[in-house]
Amino acid sequence: MSLKCETERSKTWNNFGNGIPCVLGIDEAGRGPVLGPMVYAAAISPLDQNVELKNLGVDDSKALNEAKREEIFNKMNEDEDIQQIIAYALRCLSPELISCSMLKRQKYSLNEVSHEAAITLIRDALACNVNVVEIKVDTVGPKATYQAKLEKLFPGISICVTEKADSLFPIVSAASIAAKVTRDSRLRNWQFREKNIKVPDAGYGSGYPGDPNTKKFLQLSVEPVFGFCSLVRSSWKTASTIVEKRCVPGSWEDDEEEGKSQSKRMTSWMVPKNETEVVPKRNVYFKERHMSNILTF
């Protein structure tokens, strides 16, 4: 199970700019799909290189075709002159990490997962000795709240959180391209750990719930007992609905506690004044199996 997320960095990310004031932009790709990872990217560039960034052709990744996005991303990785203008770092959040975050007892929303990824990337840039003086972020959730959160964490840095940042700021456009190309590549070249996964001849598509190929893949690949493979975000309503309809019903040991408070008063563990002994409640596991304590051997 892939629940770890490592920061991936381009060649010139460490000590980028050698102390020159830089702007950092953040964007993501793959927030909405039911298949594949969500990729967060941060791009950095000297403040005085805005024109050069535009000349590179960066734009909102959704406004560029696949060939153009890959051309720009390849230059970011292979052209030594371009690497002096821009560097980037990525965090690739697996479907399993997303699902586990959203389904665990203390639920962690997708917005919280996204914020953590962005904050980790900013901290990584600072730890790698990048002189970040401005940050531009494409908003996730209420922008004022998000901006206030970042300003509290990173005082002294000018921060702008806004909608459509990927089309307003070239540095965010560059981050958008890095995230989108990486996400598409990881999805296209996905290696299944599970055996005998049924993939339609036309493939599993873009991963978005409305994609006909994605819909077909979900219907074909669901396993009656174990549900979906690691490519699928099981926390998505699209996936959970199929599981409810197609999979064998199951129950968990704590089902009988559903709807009841999981917390107890501290005094509930103490012996009441009127009783000499407290009989602990038997776990449902032992009840269902008619198991008893052995008092003598």
From Swiss-Prot:
Its EC number is 3.1.26.4. It comes from Caenorhabditis elegans. One of its GO terms (biological process) is mismatch repair. This is Ribonuclease H2 subunit A. SUPFAM superfamilies: Ribonuclease H-like. Residues 21-248 form the RNase H type-2 domain. It comes from the Eukaryota. Its cofactor is Mn(2+); Mg(2+).
